[in-house]
Amino acid sequence: KLNLSEICLVYIEEYKRNYDKIEIIHNIESNLFVNFDHSYLDIIFNNLFKNSIEALISTNNPTIEISLKKIDKNLILTFFDNGPGYDGDIDDLIKPYFSTKNSSGLGLSLINKIITDNSYKMNITTNSYSGFKIEIIFYD
């Protein structure tokens, strides 16, 4: 089992150091463990941060908020940015090669595949006036 709390904090600190113009706020509960491959977490965190950083380029007061909490027996990782969001069909966002910018369009589809292949769940909430939120639910 991996200490997801500690892993979250490592990525948060790394991105805070490298992107000091973006406010990164976090609320991470301590000592929450998950059965998951560390390399998958690497893919998930790096893609989520990359997407948010690209979305926040022209946003005033760019902010990323990350939380990790335990509700019942589930761990819920929430990743939010106050970028422009997306008004189209949310299902498009997880289709391979779909992109709203000049990129491969593989990031969210890869995250979704990793999450669902491991029998976990991912929810996306977004629109053009309230940013982008992704919630990953790790079932115990």
List each language-model region with its residue ranges:
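Short beta-to-alpha transition helix within the HATPase_c
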Residues: 2-17
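Acidic ATP/Mg2+-coordinating residue in the GHKL
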Residues: 81
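Short conserved segment of the HATPase_c
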Residues: 86-97
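A residue-level detector for a conserved hydrophobic packing site
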Residues: 41-45
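Short beta-strand/loop element within the Bergerat-fold HATPase_c
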Residues: 61-73
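Conserved catalytic submotifs in the C-terminal HATPase_c
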Residues: 23-33
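Glycine-rich ATP-binding loops of the HATPase_c
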Residues: 119-126
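Detector for a conserved hydrophobic position within an alpha-helical segment of the HATPase_c
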Residues: 111, 115-116
